Regions:
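Cytosolic catalytic domains that perform sulfur/thiol-centered chemistry
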Residues: 1-277
């Protein structure tokens, strides 16, 4: 299984290749629009993917997967088809890009990579950027097909917990333990019974890249994960869970992602919630 990551050096060497599409997937929890940063500095040839606008507009939950038709139309307008080699990055390093990597893979893209270290590493190395509004991109056809094995809904989540599945929560420890309030109003504090906690920052190295090899494996094992068993990732709203999914993919370990995450589970009255470690 090939790595889900691409280095800044490798991407720089491939700029301008036919069939290479670069996506700025920057999104911020505080609601800031990522587009101004995209227009201030972006990797040459990049297009901007609006995570909020590309989620399911009919769901009351944040960031839910859209239908294949909606996603395919959105990607087509960005000039991306499912056969392209797609590189996704964000302006933080590794934060929202893995969510869009996961969306693309789950909805039919065949070759998607996350830029390791993102735009901060690219800029720190003095690599070329573009500014201003991007040039219009020719429309493409993206044939989106949902991989149902990649995503978990609440019914499947209940069944998985009842069967003792490994559930790995990417939220900060204080939120997981119920010691800190959730950033979204109306959600209970705590976690699903039996869930494990691996805050997403624990799989990111000091330089903003994803940990690799033994260091990455140790992060999962230290959280209690058995890497010989399947894993379901979750978080607050399905964004940072994808960072754990990315880490598992780097270890050639498949995973599924609970799309509703805590925004769904913690907002219902008929779901079990526990506090503490």
């Amino acid at each position: 299984m090939s790595s889900p990551l691409i280095s800044t050096a490798d991407l720089a060497a491939r700029l301008g290749e036919p069939g290479l599409k670069i996506i700025d997937a920057s999104w911020h929890l505080d609601g800031r629009d990522g587009r101004p940063d995209f227009e201030a500095a972006r990797i040459p040839g990049a297009v901007f993917f609006d995570l909020e606008a590309s989620s399911d507009a009919n769901s009351p939950l944040p960031h839910m997967l859209p239908s294949p038709d909606v996603f395919g139309e959105r990607m087509g307008r960005l000039g991306v088809c499912e056969r392209d080699t797609v590189v996704v990055y964000d302006t933080v390093g590794i934060r929202s890009a893995p969510r869009v990597w996961w969306m693309l893979r789950t909805l039919g893209a065949r070759n998607v990579r996350v830029l390791d270290g993102g735009l901060p590493k690219w800029l720190a190395e003095g690599r070329a950027t573009e500014t201003g509004a991007p040039r219009p991109t020719p429309h493409a056809t993206f044939r989106a097909v949902l991989d149902r094995d990649a995503v978990v809904d609440i019914r499947q989540m209940r069944d998985a917990l009842a069967q003792g599945a490994q559930v790995l929560d990417a939220r900060a420890a204080a939120r997981f333990r119920g010691e800190a309030a959730e950033p979204r109003a109306g959600l209970r504090s705590g976690h699903m019974p039996g869930a494990l906690n691996l805050p997403f920052l624990d799989v990111i190295a000091a330089d903003g890249t994803l940990k690799r090899g033994a260091d990455l494996e140790a992060a999962f094992r230290d959280a209690g994960v058995d890497l010989d068993r399947p894993v379901i990732t979750t978080c607050g709203s399905g964004v940072t869970a994808a960072i754990l999914s990315l880490g598992l993919a780097e270890l050639a370990h498949p995973s599924r992602l609970y799309d509703g995450s805590w925004a769904e589970w913690g907002g219902r009255e008929d779901t079990a919630v526990v506090t503490g470690p």
